[in-house]
Amino acid sequence: MEKMKAKHIPRIDIHDRIELKNALPLRTPYVIYIDPCDTCNFRCKFCPSGNLELMKKTRGRGHGPMDFEMYKGIIDSLQEFPDPVRVIRLYKEGEPLVNPRFADMVRYAKASPKVQRVDTTTNASLLTPERSLEIIDAGLDRINISVEGINADQYRDFSGHKMDYQQFVDNIAFFYDHKKQCEMNIKINGDILTPEQEEEFYRTFGNITDGINVERTIEYWPKYNDMKVGFDEGVSLLGGAANPVY
């Protein structure tokens, strides 16, 4: 492997990390996830958000970009906590940059005395130079970029998205060149790569990011598909009646 600027680090943010067992009970949450948009412009094979038919059947999904006034209310409500929240994570199920006011969301959170850091995870397909400058100037502390292939054909096959791959790489390089305070990390699913393609991934992105990583999937629940597990949508995780609020 050729020498590169980036360090091999996971996308998990371990900034100022404290073991939870030594901090309980918490006075204030360490991390709060807020989904700027619960829909995505990709149709990745591994992700439920890319399955349009499934999302149509799923209660509470398909709202699109979060209303900015609702978002402001969430950030304002953090005043009720005694301490600042360590991280506001602007990412959950959808693609954050589908929300046209993403930079405003970053800026509003960073202006709050109850927020220490703001980060996000994105597929970066909408990360144009103009939006990059907006997001950086808003004060984003960390951006994780999920790469889904090493060429346009692989992207189209894996994520159902047609793109100008070289422009995609150039846009990421632009963000890196102008990132100021923002820490940058790029990762890819190594299960879709040959050893030669993995080397190409490092050559392409290894000098335009702070951190880089090839992730591997593991079997989280062995033999799950062989188990006969009943599921009742009317029952909550705690055993009571499920009463979704939309």
Across the structure, where does each feature detected by a protein language model lie?
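Conserved alpha-helical substructure of the radical SAM core
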Residues: 2-142, 154-157, 162, 166
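Conserved C-terminal portion of the radical SAM core fold
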Residues: 82-91, 111-119, 136-151, 165-228
